């Protein structure tokens, strides 16, 4: 959440990797106020599978375990990062729409969270922007 660590030489990685780095660094700058807000790491007995931070009406949640339910708050905009090895996450929270993106920022889909529990298709290493409606 705070400081990125880039442990590769940018001139020695493929362009697709550099594109991913550029995208995530720009996204980190965009979400700086959220990243600097207090962190809440959940379920220490499960090795913190969910970490979240919120600033005003924007929240960021990172999910590290595909077996977790991502509980959405009342934030207007929530960024849900998929740090698991699967292509979908189970979300709890209705009346929201989402747009998912891959790790380079390319849109991969849209969906609605119409039921209290809904699966969202989010690429591994990607994220979704959830908007309350």
Question: What is the predicted function of each stretch?
Answer:
Residues 1-125, 131-132:
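Active-site-proximal substrate-binding groove within the catalytic cores of carbohydrate-active enzymes
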């Amino acid at each position: 959440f705070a400081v990125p660590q880039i442990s590769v030489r940018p001139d020695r990685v493929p362009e697709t990797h550099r594109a991913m780095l550029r995208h995530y660094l720009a996204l980190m700058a965009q979400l700086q106020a959220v990243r600097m807000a207090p962190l809440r790491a959940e379920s220490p007995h499960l090795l913190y599978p969910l970490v979240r931070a919120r600033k005003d009406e924007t929240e960021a949640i990172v999910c590290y375990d595909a077996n977790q339910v991502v509980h959405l708050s009342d934030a207007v905009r929530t960024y849900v990062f998929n740090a698991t090895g699967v292509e979908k996450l189970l979300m709890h929270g209705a009346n929201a729409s989402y747009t998912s993106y891959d790790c380079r920022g390319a849109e991969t889909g849209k969906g609605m969270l119409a039921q209290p529990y809904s699966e969202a298709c989010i690429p591994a290493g990607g994220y979704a922007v959830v908007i309350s409606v």
